């Protein structure tokens, strides 16, 4: 799958080996999975199995993969759609199932992130009940998903409200998942891609 959708990039084994090396050097990484294009269900779980294996090999002192973020293929205007006719038919229910299965299948990766950017508020809220412990962040700059037409927009305040509506207390964090206090004035910051 990677050879088809990521031409010109390293192959899966090379990427996994880079992650292993990073973990041995105590460099924290994250892992993603874009799905809903040309892959099969079996290939999705092969992806998860490889991540679980790499995480199990990390040194005891290292965090390894600090988070796993599954996100749905955003097909608008992509070469993959034009040439391969790949179309994202992933439903919200299917995305929630992927979050739940990721939580079960990846017990050695502490944080599972719901991709509000690709699935929107309502689905991301359900994901918090299905095993996601991270809503994701407000990105200062995001070019990949937004270029493919992801329609979802939030302010810091609206993210906090959405998390509270789902029954959880929002917590600002660093990239290393350390808690931070919410700075003054950030509540109204509008992120528009």
What do these predicted ranges mean?
Residues 5-12, 37, 41, 88, ...:
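Hydrophobic alpha-helical scaffolding
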Residues 23, 48-52, 56-193:
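Auxiliary Fe-S-binding modules of radical SAM enzymes
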Residues 2, 41-44, 80:
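Short acidic, glycine/serine/threonine-rich loops at helix termini
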Residues 1-24, 28-31, 37:
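Core AdoMet radical
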Residues 10, 35-51, 117-118:
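Active-site glycine- and acidic-residue-rich loops that bind
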Residues 3-6, 32-35, 86, 115, ...:
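Conserved short-loop catalytic and cofactor-binding motifs
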């Amino acid at each position: 799958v990677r050879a088809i959708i990521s031409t010109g990039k390293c192959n899966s084994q090379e990427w996994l080996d880079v992650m292993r090396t990073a973990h041995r050097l105590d460099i924290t990484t994250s892992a993603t999975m874009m799905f809903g294009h040309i892959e099969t269900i079996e290939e999705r779980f092969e992806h998860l199995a490889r991540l679980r294996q790499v995480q199990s090999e990390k040194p005891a002192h290292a965090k390894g993969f600090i988070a796993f973020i599954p996100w749905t293929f955003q097909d608008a205007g992509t070469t993959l759609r034009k040439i391969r006719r790949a179309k994202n038919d992933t439903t919200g229910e299917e995305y929630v199932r992927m979050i739940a299965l990721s939580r079960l299948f990846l017990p050695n990766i502490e944080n599972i992130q719901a991709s509000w950017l690709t699935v929107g508020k309502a689905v991301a809220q359900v994901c918090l009940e299905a095993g996601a412990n991270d809503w994701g962040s407000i990105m200062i700059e995001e070019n990949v998903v937004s270029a493919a037409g992801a329609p979802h927009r939030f302010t810091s305040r609206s993210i906090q409200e959405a998390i509270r509506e789902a029954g959880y207390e929002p917590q600002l964090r660093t990239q290393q998942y350390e808690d931070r206090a919410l700075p003054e004035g950030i509540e109204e910051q509008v992120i528009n891609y």
